[in-house]
Amino acid sequence: MTIKDFDTKKVILEDQYKSDKYETMTLYFIAPKEWLEGLYPDAVHTEISVEYPLNCPEAYAATVMVSPTRNLGEDGYEDYDWSDLEMSLSDIEALIGMAKS
């Protein structure tokens, strides 16, 4: 999947998860549901994850994925149907930079 008109100003850093076991850092971002291009009408927003090795926090080493998020009411929210997201290195660098600032 690709996102047309990607804009970091429309993205919010939601969480960071460091895995000592796998030696990775995963960043989670909330983005507009419109970026899913209507594929998931029940989505409340788009979730983007960026995962990279702890010893190489660089865009070229990152894996980027995207998922719709749905509201489960009292049970909270659920990210589902994860898929690979193709992004430019500069956009990935911008997302990693958001977590560093």
Residue ranges of model-derived segments:
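Extreme N-terminal leader/activation tails
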Residues: 1-19
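Short intrinsically disordered terminal tails
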Residues: 1-4, 74, 97-101
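Acidic, low-complexity, intrinsically disordered interaction modules
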Residues: 19-91
